[in-house]
C-alpha cells in the first residue's frame, strides 16, 4: 500500500472514530448508572442536578413538530474543583427508549433561562434550561451528560 493511501485511510479512520465516539459510548454505557430528577450527580470535580422537567406545546410560531412536545429541563451545574470548568449545552443529550440520542432543540421557548456555553470559576454554579423535542408522552427518557467526549465520564439521569 502506498504512503498516500495509508495516510488517507488513517484520516478516514480517525474521522469515523471521533465522529461516532459519543454515540457509541453512550449507547454502550448510559444505562449502567442512572440518577433521578433532583439527585446530585458528581462527576470528578463537578456536580449536576436536574431540578425539574416541564412540557410545553410552544408559543406563537415557536412550536414543536406535529405529534411532539418540548421538554424543558432546568438544571444546575457546579464547579467543585480548584480550576476553571468550561461547560456547553451540547454536553447534554437525550436518549429515548430505543437508544436514539438527540441534542438540544433550537427554540426561544426558554428565553433568557437557556443554558449557554461558559466558564465556571471554582465554587461557582450555573442554572439554566435546555429544550428537546420528543413525541408527546414519551416514556423512559434519559439525560446523558458528557462533559468530555474523550473521557469515559458520562452521567445519566432518568427523566
Features from the language model and the residues they span:
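Conserved functional micro-motifs across diverse proteins
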Residues: 2-159
Amino acid at each position: 500500500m502506498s504512503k498516500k493511501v495509508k495516510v488517507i485511510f488513517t484520516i478516514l479512520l480517525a474521522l469515523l472514530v471521533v465522529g461516532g465516539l459519543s454515540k457509541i459510548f453512550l449507547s454502550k454505557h448510559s444505562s449502567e448508572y442512572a440518577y433521578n430528577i433532583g439527585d446530585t450527580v458528581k462527576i470528578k470535580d463537578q456536580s449536576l442536578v436536574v431540578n425539574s422537567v416541564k412540557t410545553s406545546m410552544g408559543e406563537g410560531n415557536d412550536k414543536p413538530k406535529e405529534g411532539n412536545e418540548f421538554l424543558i429541563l432546568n438544571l444546575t451545574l457546579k464547579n467543585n474543583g480548584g480550576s476553571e470548568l468550561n461547560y456547553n449545552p451540547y454536553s447534554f443529550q437525550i436518549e429515548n427508549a430505543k437508544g436514539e440520542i438527540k441534542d438540544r432543540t433550537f427554540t426561544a421557548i426558554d428565553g433568557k433561562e437557556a443554558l449557554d456555553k461558559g466558564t465556571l470559576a471554582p465554587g461557582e454554579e450555573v442554572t439554566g434550561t435546555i429544550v428537546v423535542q420528543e413525541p408527546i408522552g414519551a416514556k423512559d427518557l434519559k439525560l446523558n451528560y458528557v462533559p468530555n467526549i474523550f473521557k469515559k465520564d458520562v452521567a445519566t439521569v432518568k427523566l
